[in-house]
Amino acid sequence: MSSHPSTRRDRYDCFGDTASAVGRAAAILAGLQQVPADHTAVAAEIAMLADRSADTPDTATADRRLGRVLHSVLTRLRTSAEHANRHCVTSLADELAEVVGIIEECGRHTARQFAAPFDPTWAAWYRAEILRLADDADDAFRRLFARWYFDTDDLSAVAGMRELSEELEEVVRAFEAVAEAVPAIFADQPTELPR
């Protein structure tokens, strides 16, 4: 009898700690929604979390891609927090607060996906949910870009928000990459519908 499925399961499970860190970092970033936001604390907490999660497990090729994109999410979350701190962001534009909430939800789903039993059906659900949330984020970005120059005469504040928004968009793209990489772990695996 082949041990391939259990081996793949073990390889999948080895990313649980990183996925959990992604979920925690996204929840910490959500602190930017508060008014006033403690941008210094948010940046410091995410930096510590990212430093503790720096190692990528040594796994098969498809799995290495998953490891890379999970760590990319952490890196992008860290950079977003650094931008918010650099520009002393204490109050987000409404659309960016919405995006930060979407990112928090993506992080929560990611942590749950890797904490759940090994099941390709749930991987497909996860992918669909992340892509749906990414569409919601894109809509928020479009609304922001359509109006934000009319909201303030403070060009430095606009520049800071633009830099932060660009990095938050990269966070969303990184979550999309995770969503696309997860199903590869289940290639050639029979699908078991949840009971």
Where in the sequence are the language-model features?
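Cytosolic, long alpha-helical scaffolding segments
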Residues: 1-195
